[in-house]
């Protein structure tokens, strides 16, 4: 029941997000492409494509790689580090800045949406079953 309510809430927020593809960039200068936040799971650049560079939990450029620079909860470049000083940014294809993708609730200009807030709270469960969560959220 709880999962159904969360899924419904996510669907409502996705209507507005689907209008613009959101891109994730990480690294000290935010010049490392980390994938598309709201692309479908068949897009080769989607963070939801578990077989692609940005969705694989084994890829060095994936936020789902718990041992990697961009996916470890201990890395300052990871969205999952609650104390990250340089988390990834979310921008659109025109370069418009939406905010930082981070679990750090105290960082200035944190990107906050229902989808991102949900991902930041449940990233471990999502990482372990990416395709099922994609189907639930989208």
Report residues per predicted region.
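Repetitive, compositionally biased segments used for assembly/scaffolding
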Residues: 18-138
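Sec-dependent N-terminal signal peptides
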Residues: 4-15
């Amino acid at each position: 029941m709880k999962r159904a309510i969360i899924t419904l809430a996510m669907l409502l927020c996705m209507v507005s997000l689907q209008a613009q593809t959101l891109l994730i960039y990480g690294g000290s200068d935010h010049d490392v492409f980390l994938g598309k936040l709201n692309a479908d799971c068949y897009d080769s650049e989607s963070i939801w494509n578990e077989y692609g560079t940005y969705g694989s939990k084994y890829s060095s450029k994936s936020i789902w790689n718990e041992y990697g620079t961009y996916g470890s909860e201990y890395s300052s470049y990871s969205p999952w580090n609650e104390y990250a000083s340089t988390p990834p940014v979310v921008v659109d294809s025109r370069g418009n800045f939406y905010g930082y993708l981070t679990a750090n609730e105290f960082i200035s200009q944190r990107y906050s949406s229902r989808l991102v807030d949900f991902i930041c709270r449940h990233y471990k469960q999502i990482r372990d079953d990416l395709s099922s969560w994609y189907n639930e959220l989208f």
